[in-house]
Swiss-Prot record:
<dbReference type="InterPro" id="IPR019347">
    <property type="entry name" value="Axonemal_dynein_light_chain"/>
</dbReference>
<feature type="coiled-coil region">
    <location>
        <begin position="571"/>
        <end position="596"/>
    </location>
</feature>
<dbReference type="InterPro" id="IPR052845">
    <property type="entry name" value="Axonemal_dynein_LC_domain"/>
</dbReference>
<feature type="coiled-coil region">
    <location>
        <begin position="451"/>
        <end position="480"/>
    </location>
</feature>
<keyword id="KW-0963">Cytoplasm</keyword>
<dbReference type="GO" id="GO:1905198">
    <property type="term" value="P:manchette assembly"/>
</dbReference>
<feature type="coiled-coil region">
    <location>
        <begin position="316"/>
        <end position="402"/>
    </location>
</feature>
<protein>
    <recommendedName>
        <fullName>Axonemal dynein light chain domain-containing protein 1</fullName>
    </recommendedName>
</protein>
<comment type="function">
    <text>May be essential for spermiogenesis and male fertility probably by regulating the manchette dynamics, spermatid head shaping and sperm flagellum assembly.</text>
</comment>
<dbReference type="GO" id="GO:0007283">
    <property type="term" value="P:spermatogenesis"/>
</dbReference>
<feature type="compositionally biased region" description="Polar residues">
    <location>
        <begin position="1"/>
        <end position="17"/>
    </location>
</feature>
<keyword id="KW-0175">Coiled coil</keyword>
<feature type="region of interest" description="Disordered">
    <location>
        <begin position="1"/>
        <end position="31"/>
    </location>
</feature>
<dbReference type="GO" id="GO:0005737">
    <property type="term" value="C:cytoplasm"/>
</dbReference>
<keyword id="KW-0744">Spermatogenesis</keyword>
<dbReference type="Pfam" id="PF10211">
    <property type="entry name" value="Ax_dynein_light"/>
</dbReference>
<keyword id="KW-0221">Differentiation</keyword>
Amino acid sequence: MSLPKTPSTPLNSASTSESKKLVSVATEGTRGLPELKEKKNMVDRSKPLPTSLLNEFIPKEVLLSLTYAANAGPCPENLLPPKKIKTPKGTLPRLVDHVWHHPVRRNKFKYLIDHPVSLTGAGRDISFLYDVKYTKGQTREKAVCPPHLARSLQSHDGVIVPHKPKTLTDTLIPEEFHIVSSTGVSGLECYDDKYTTLLTDSENRLLLFPSMKPNKRVEVAQLNDVMDTMLERAGVENQEYTGPTKMHKLLHILKKEQTIYNTIFHELIRQVSVDCADRGELLSKVRERYVQMLDQIARQMIDFYKDLVTQRVMDQRILEELYNFKHVIEELTRELCLVRAHDVKLTKETEKAHKDLAQALLDAEKNAKMVEEYHDLYTLQRERMENDMKQLMAERDIWSSATYELALKVIERNRVILARRLYLNEKGWNKYTKHLIILLANKDTEDLALLQKLTQKWRNLVNKFKQEVEEMEESTRETLKIVEKGLTKWQESFNEKDILSPNNGNVFDSVILDFKQWQKMLNEKKEEFTGDVLLSKYDTLKIIKHLQENWTDIGLGIFNRHKSLEGELPSERQYMEEIIKNIQKLYKEYEIRINGDNGYSKILPILISSLDFCSFKLENLEFPDTPLEEWQEIDEKINEMKLQLDLLLNLTGIVPQHIDMDSVSVLQAYIFNMIQQWLLKIGNEINNGNIELQRHMDELHISMIQWMVNLLILMIPNFTDQDCLLKLEEESAEKHDIGVARLELDAIELTRKLYQYSRYLSSSCEGMVTAMALSKSTTSHRNATEDLYEVDKLKKECYEWINTCSCLLSNIKGRKITLLTYEEIEQLLEEEAVKEFIEPEMDESLLCSRRILLP
């Protein structure tokens, strides 16, 4: 606490007479101190006091001694510690006593300046135990509050202390209970100055030496009144003061009182030192011991308070932990109840599942027994049916062999030689047909696997070729961008006014080097469209085309083997032609992109010549005296090159718009998808074709057997000797005519089907067996032409069966029946085979027919 400052006018009046001082002191002694008023009625210090109030204050020397710290202004720069120079005259509030002019005497009274009065709140009192600055309605920063629960706010005298968020600290003691010490007053550094000393506290203020003028009893009485008044005022203020806690109020009172005692004690020491320096020094020592004792008490209080705060914190933390523990116990209890309920539910479900499982096991055992019984019954039934089938097959074989033997005997007895031959021809035709169908199926399977392998290899090569072309185009695009960027940079540099100044040097050298470098890069890219790189690309494209032709030929071979009976190719052939058409478009687009026909081959040489022209112009220009027309021509040429570069960048990776083509990526993906669908269709066509061939063969086989049986029944006479019973001639003749007519119609229809099927199968397998024979002959296979002979045998057996049918029908009808024309025979057999088979067969057929007609 500081007393009100006195006006500056009476402090600076050093020339006032001693008589005026005595009168003022006497008057003040009789009147005493005036009553202190409220703070709002305090006299304004910035204005000089009225004359009527000058005599109402304490003596000047006492007042100056009491308030010299309050009136001490900031330390001038020339009095700061690093600068030890004299204080200019005329800046001090009063003259210094002569005792301070002598170093020895000043050293004797050094205790007066060792413990100055500080008004910055840094006195050595016990108020630093609780560093808090409190004003009505708010608590300043670093406020220390008593322990409180973390989840609530406490209110003390209308002050709400907010809860700060927790932070990581380097101590276990909570931040709200830290003890913050005030900055104490440092010791004075006494300079060898005759008038001043420097108070090195927190503000480095200038401190005047205490007055050493003699004191009277009136001054002591006046000092007593001042102390009482100050204590009274402190009591009044303390009653008005309300802090957050009682500790705040107690410390506030202690601080106020200790400040007053410190100030009064300092003045007493000064007054005693005037009369007796030794007594003053003794009082100073007593004061120092007293301060040390208070300091020790304060430290003990600090320790006690720390223990108290720590205990409170521990209690608070223990309470919080207990609360948390209780909360956790409640949560665990709740979870335990839920777990128990869930456990009960699971137990019930488990018991139910166990019962269901036991019931299911019982049912399974019953079902297993039932299944076992059914299995035994099925086994018995199967064995019985197998035995029956074996018996039936044995009976069938017996009857078949008996029928065959009887038929042979009948044929031999009745001399039906052609019927036996007809049976053998049908049996041979069936054998060769089955073998060729198996060969055809195996060949189709091999070709389909090879076709899938070749198409996959072709797709891989196309993808690789596409990647190479795109990498080349990307490299070309990067080169064009570099050239365009460089041209733009130099054009902008040429447009600047300072670029051609002599101070910048000759910039043409750098430009010419860049132009030549760009010209070299573009020449390399030009070689890619005309040199060995182009030939390499064409060779790769030829390999791709050759591979595509290979799998195309394999596909055509499969289609030729699977024509319809009418000779029409399957629909997959048209689909393949569409694929080939799109592939040709793809090849054409790739050729345009690799040889530069999309515009590169025309624009790139022009661009290179333009760069060469600009380089030549720049080499011949004289720096810096360059005509404006030359610059305009170069600038126009650069603009032209930039347009050409933009056009080339737009043409990269595409073909001109006037060519009706899709994008390469889209077209290529479309082709790959078509090939995949085409392979699936070919696989389905092969399976369906082989199944259809087998079905037609089975139908023809049954039809041929049925026709032969009908022929035998019709040809064998009803009796062969006189012992047989006679039938009615009319019924026999009518039935014979109907049977002959039906036999003729069936023979004509069967002949057409057999001729068409045999010709179709032989034409489908002829190329296949020829290739197989050539392949086997190259490996020196012993039976290289066996499959080829089987095709000829198939046709021969077909022709002989048809020819035998024709002879038999001719003999039965009594007129010549022709089932095949000469042209059809030539189509079925080759010319040489026709000559070999037709004439002998005709003679033999005539002889056989004569034998059949003989009785």
